[in-house]
Amino acid sequence: MKSLLLSVPVESSGSSLRVEPLRAAHLHGLQTEGLGDDLPRFQRLLLRSLVARLDGLWPGEPITRQPRVLVALEQGILRALVQVRPYNRQWSCWLLSLEELSPGQWVGRRQLLKALLQQALLGTDVRSRSWVIRCDSSCDEQLDVLRELGFQPLKTQRIWRPGNADASQPAALPHTPTPLPTTCQWSPLNRRTAPLLWPLEQAASSSHLRQIIDRRYPDLLDQSGRHTGVLLWDSGEASVAIAGLVRQELADGSFGIELLRDVAWDERLSQALPALLDQLLTQRPAVVLVTDQADSPLSQLLTTGGWHPLREELLLGRSLWRQHGRSRAVPLTHPLDTMLGRLQPQHPPLPTPSLGRR
C-alpha cells in the first residue's frame, strides 16, 4: 500500500510548532496573515492535495500525480509549505518544492523547516529511492537544513530575465521577430519529438544526477507546454535536435523555460538561438530563462542579446540508490582455496591417447 501523509502534527519541545497536511481550516487565517491574495492559489493546492491523498488510499497503481502538500505552523500561523510530487513516471524520484510564507527570521525557523522537510520525505511513496529540491543559492539557512537531511548539490543553474522586463525602461515597440535559418525548424514538444530532445537532456546532467532522477524520455512530456519544443536542423537526410526549450519549476514556485543544448558548442546555435529567443520574447515578453551556470558560451550569447542574470539556483538531491547498490555488491576478493577449487577437475582425467605406431 502506498505511503500517505497522515494528519499527525509534529510537536517540538517547548514551542507550538506543527507540521500537518494542508486543510480547509488553514485557509481561514490567510487574510489576517497578509496572504489574502494567495487564497485562490491555496484553494487550488488544497483541491489537488485532497485528490493526491484520496489516491493514496486506493490500492494498486496510482491514478493521479497531483502534489501532496504539507504546511508548517508556529503558534497557528502559516510559516511555510512544501509540495511533494513524483519527478518521474516510475515514482522512484520525487520533487520537493519548499516555500516560506513568512520571509525573514523568526523563532524556530530552522527547526520548523527541518521538521517540515522530514515529514515530506516520510510521506512519499514506498517506491521512492531519491528526492530532489531546488534552492536559491543565497538561502544559507535552507541549504544548511537540506545538507543536514542528506541533500547534496547536483547542479547550479542561472536564471535570466530579458532586458525588456525592466519596469523602469520604456516598453519596446512591436516588431517582426527574426526568422529562423531556412535549415532550422521549430517543433512543439510531443511524443514524436521527445526522443529527439532526449540526448540533449541527458547531456545537461551528470551521470550521478541521471542516476538520482531516474528519468526516461517520456518524462520530458511532463515539461511540455506553451513555448516548449525542439529546434531541429535539417541535414538533408534526417532532422537533428540542436536545442530545446522545456518547462521548469523554480525554487520560488514559479515556472521558467529551460534551454537545453549539447555539451559541445554547436556553431549553428550562434545564428539559430538569437532568432529562436527573439520569437519567444515576441510571444512571452516576461519569460524567465534557465541555463546551466557553467555554460559560458551560452551565457555570453544571452548577455550579448540583452538578457540579465537574476540569481543562481541549486538543484540538490538525496538518494538511496547507493545504499541499495552497496548491499547487493559482489565481493571483489575470494579466498584462494575457493578460486583454486574452481580449477580442480570434476571428473577423473581421461587417459592420454598414444601417438606411437600401432
What is the predicted function of each stretch?
Residues 104-123, 144, 148, 265-281:
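Conserved acetyl-CoA-binding loop-helix of GNAT-fold acetyltransferases
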Residues 2-82, 148-253:
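Amide-forming acyltransferase catalytic core, primarily the GNAT-like/NAT-type
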Residues 236-288:
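Intrinsically disordered, low-complexity segments enriched in Gly and acidic/Ser/Thr residues
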Residues 2-11, 149-175, 287-358:
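Active-site/acyl-donor-binding loops of N-acyltransferases
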Residues 69-70, 82, 92-96, 116-121, ...:
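Short, structured motif recognition centered on aromatic/hydrophobic residues
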Residues 89-108, 251-267:
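Conserved acetyl-CoA binding element of GNAT-fold acetyltransferases
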Residues 124-136, 282-293:
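Conserved GNAT acetyl-CoA-binding A-motif
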Residues 84-88:
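DNA polymerase sliding clamps and clamp-related checkpoint/processivity subunits
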